[in-house]
């Protein structure tokens, strides 16, 4: 486990022996909460999970992840310099996260649209459950998925953080918590983007 700090918040990152990111926490107020969250989101058991964060590759990859999040929170568009380990995810969850990774900055879509693109239009709730367990928040932008009526829906980090992340990306959110329709991606556009995007894992 690598723990980094952004301002007064902690981010915990779990890294496997192949230098891939297994899971990470959202920025949290305490180191313990961040570590517990990252561990709870890990889809696989790490045989060496108590290995020292001072191992050179853990330190290097952990710093890269924290720098990615830091750049993102500054409004920049950082590029992935590390790999994600999706080994423990179900095929459905992989499909959901892959589709969500193709949603461009400045846009949102809804749970129902994601369900249709992955091939099961009745699976909106299952999509929501998969996103609630997203091992790589912010990196795989589950905050860009909202309800069909364009209200924000849920978010593990709370709705205020979801609103903040969307605003960083230039998405207009009304005081009542609804995204403006100009930012919405239809099923058709989402399908095209997901087919043409480079896979994150």
Kindly label every feature range from the protein language model.
Residues 1-121, 168, 172-201:
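Basic nucleic-acid-binding alpha-helical/helix-turn surface characteristic of O6-alkylguanine DNA
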Residues 122-160, 173:
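Short glycine/serine-rich loop segments
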Residues 86-87, 159-161:
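Non-transmembrane, interaction-prone segments in cytosolic or luminal domains
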């Amino acid at each position: 486990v690598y723990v980094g700090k952004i301002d007064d918040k902690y981010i915990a990152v779990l890294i496997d022996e192949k230098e891939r990111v297994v899971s990470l926490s959202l920025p949290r107020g305490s180191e313990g909460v961040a570590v517990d969250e990252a561990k709870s989101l890990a889809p696989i058991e790490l045989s060496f999970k108590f290995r020292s964060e001072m191992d050179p590759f853990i330190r290097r990859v952990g710093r890269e992840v924290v720098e990615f999040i830091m750049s993102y929170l500054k409004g920049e568009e950082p590029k992935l310099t590390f790999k994600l380990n999706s080994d423990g995810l179900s095929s459905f969850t992989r499909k959901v996260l892959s589709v969500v990774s193709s949603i461009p900055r400045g846009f949102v879509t809804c749970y129902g649209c994601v369900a249709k693109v992955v091939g099961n239009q009745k699976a909106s709730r299952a999509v929501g459950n998969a996103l609630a367990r997203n091992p790589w928040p912010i990196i795989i932008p589950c905050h860009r998925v909202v309800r069909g009526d364009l209200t924000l829906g849920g978010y593990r980090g709370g709705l205020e953080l979801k609103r903040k992340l969307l605003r960083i990306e230039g998405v207009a959110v009304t005081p009542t918590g609804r995204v403006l329709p100009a930012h919405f991606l239809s099923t058709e556009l989402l399908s095209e983007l997901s087919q043409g995007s480079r896979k994150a894992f």
